[in-house]
């Protein structure tokens, strides 16, 4: 592992344990086993490290989305994939993405850091809301809107559909964070949730 990657890993470990605001560059350098001046050869500041962590997370997410043949951010293109998926296929995709958010080291620790910091740092509170609520709801409501327009789903309010779909999944994710021993039980609920949602809103045989 190269030094830049070691710095990111050490920084994220510290951020997730102490919160972003309570970690200093010297601590990160010490955790890596280098001096602070050496760290600055790789990253200009703590914020630069933070931004690099976000970029690493995006890369990880994009790789995971690609394994499912979706973009993961573009509702227009992904609606085609979801419209052709069976109920079992949607459950499989849901499990894959849920497992990624739950177990990917960067994503898991970053979420923990944001949970800590959301009540102390307004900027990070906004980032938390954007990443785990606003962006997800926008993406999902976009997909539901397109599927309703094509007569695949029934429903006249894609935003409410997105709330109904996303909120239980986010709740299950946070419960798994707090009580990892319940993962099997909670992922069973995830499957039931996806299947019930599909059956409530599906109009055709694909979904």
Which ranges hold each PLM region?
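Hydrophobic/aromatic-rich alpha-helical bundle segments in the mid-to-C-terminal region
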Residues: 126, 130, 134, 144-195
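Hydrophobic/aromatic residues within well-ordered alpha-helical segments
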Residues: 46, 53, 57, 61, ...
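Amphipathic alpha-helical interface segments
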Residues: 10, 14, 56, 96, ...
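Amphipathic alpha-helical packing segments from all-alpha helical-bundle domains
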Residues: 102-115, 119-149
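Hydrophobic alpha-helical connector segments
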Residues: 52, 65-104, 161-162
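Short, Lys/Arg-enriched anionic-surface-contact patches
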Residues: 1-3
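Helix-turn-helix
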Residues: 6, 14-56
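C-terminal effector-binding regulatory domain of bacterial HTH transcription factors
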Residues: 199-207
């Amino acid at each position: 592992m190269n030094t830049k990657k070691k710095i990111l890993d050490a920084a994220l470990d510290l951020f997730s344990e102490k919160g972003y605001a309570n970690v200093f560059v010297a601590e990160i350098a010490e955790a890596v086993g280098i001096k602070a001046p050496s760290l600055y050869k790789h990253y200009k500041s703590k914020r630069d490290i933070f931004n690099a962590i976000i970029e690493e997370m995006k890369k990880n997410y994009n790789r995971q989305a690609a394994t499912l043949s979706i973009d993961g951010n573009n509702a227009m293109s992904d609606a085609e994939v979801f419209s052709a998926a069976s109920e079992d296929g949607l459950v499989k995709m849901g499990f894959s993405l849920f497992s990624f958010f739950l177990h990917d080291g960067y994503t898991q620790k970053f979420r923990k850091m944001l949970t800590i910091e959301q009540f102390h740092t307004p900027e990070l509170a906004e980032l938390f809301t954007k990443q785990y609520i606003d962006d997800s709801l926008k993406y999902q409501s976009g997909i539901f809107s397109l599927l309703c327009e094509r007569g695949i789903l029934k429903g006249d309010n894609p935003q409410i559909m997105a709330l109904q779909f996303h909120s239980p999944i986010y709740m299950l994710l946070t419960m798994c964070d707090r009580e990892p021993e319940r993962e099997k039980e909670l992922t069973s609920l995830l499957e039931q949730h996806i299947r019930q949602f599909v059956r409530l809103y599906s109009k055709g045989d694909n979904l």
